[in-house]
Amino acid sequence: MDNRTAFLNTVAQALGRPLRREPQAEAAPVNNYANERLTELSPQQRCDAFVQFASEVMLAQCELTHEAQAPEAALRLCQQLGQQPVVVSGDSRLAELGITERLQRECNAVVWDPVRGAENIVQAEQAKVGVVYAEYGLTESGGVVLFSAPERGRSISLLPESSIFVLRKSSILPRVAQLAQVLHQKAQAGERMPSCINIISGPSSTADIELIKVVGVHGPVKAVYLIIEDC
């Protein structure tokens, strides 16, 4: 008998049972909330819950529009938030919606261009409004998900005074578990993962001091979710 077995025998005797060489099977979980919570909601119910939580708890402004009205809605929001200067993500989906061209024409918006390097960061720092396209929304937390890429710099939604997140209603997921499933499927399919995945829940805020919530401490003071009704 080696020292390890002798030691374990002593512990087992003290516990009043024989030495176990195989771990006991884990008890069946009481629930599977991590994967199933909020999945029973319809797309409309998810959107309603997302808007309610984001606006009431995360203090984000939520606006719904249709694809045809998206450029006008984005322009109106930029005007409310200070209009100029505006920096827009180089995301082709914003261009396809007509948002990029409209803001360039009406607000002299600058489009993030990886060729310009650090100049992009300076422009984002000086901008009143940053406009980005969100990959997903998360019902449970009222947050939006951003995938970084050379044409979609993180600074666009971090440095300007206000941020506008363009989000499709059909892309609102129940919670982060479903986002993990999407990422896993992409990885299994051999797709290249984004260099940075950000989950942003409303404007920057903190409640570290005496549990008093203060907004705009270390990032945008205002966050607007422009939700396109596509389902």
Language-model features and meaning:
Residues M1-C231:
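The feature marks the mature, well-folded catalytic cores of soluble enzymes
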